[in-house]
Swiss-Prot record:
It comes from the Bacteria. Keywords: Nucleotide-binding. PANTHER family: UPF0234 PROTEIN YAJQ. GO terms for molecular function: nucleotide binding. Disulfide bonds: none annotated. Belongs to the YajQ family. GO terms for cellular component: cytosol. NCBIfam families: PRK05412.1. It comes from Acinetobacter baumannii (strain AYE). Nucleotide-binding protein. Signal peptide: none annotated. This is Nucleotide-binding protein ABAYE0515.
């Protein structure tokens, strides 16, 4: 019976490349010369830390990071920016990375599938949702339906079986 899995995975090596490209752009931009501006990725905690001298520079670096995410085809919904806080003479902004389906989001997705009226079976299996049906076309309808919805994090469809 055809099935597929709905997951929300983040490729950390792509995120790392986006952060490195942002670091290179910071080094070459004229408006950041002579200023203490840095961005670093903590893969263990899955967060990005921006440190600048002003709140405005913090916003600029965040926008640069978003642009590099777009260029690397990483969904920016995976970013969860926290409020920039002042620590000493620097502003620090922590951006948490959303990776994996939490149980609340999985329940919302499962409920949306059931309320859509598409006759499929969906079940939550840990950090993924398995959707099964007799026809591939019905599964593709579910995929199209979910792409239209906004759940606050990027969704991928994998493990498609016939």
């Amino acid at each position: 019976m055809p099935s597929f899995d709905i997951v929300s995975e983040l490729e950390l090596f792509e995120v790392n490349h986006a952060v490195q490209n942002t670091q290179k752009e910071i080094a070459t931009r004229f408006d950041f010369r002579g200023h203490d501006v840095s961005i670093e990725l903590n893969e263990k905690n899955k967060e990005i830390k921006i440190s600048t001298e002003s709140d405005f520079q913090c916003e600029q670096v965040y926008n640069m990071l978003e642009n590099h995410f777009y260029k690397r085809k990483i969904d920016v919904q995976a970013l969860d920016p926290q409020k920039a806080t002042a620590s000493g003479k620097n502003f620090v902004q922590v951006i948490k990375l959303k990776d994996g389906l939490d149980s609340d989001t999985a329940k919302k997705i499962n409920k949306a599938i059931k309320e859509s009226g598409i006759k499929v079976q969906s079940s939550i299996q840990g950090d993924k949702i398995r959707v099964t049906d007799k026809k591939r076309d019905t599964l593709q309808q579910v995929m199209a339906f979910l792409r239209e919805q906004q759940f606050g994090l990027p969704l991928q469809f994998n493990n498609f079986k016939d």
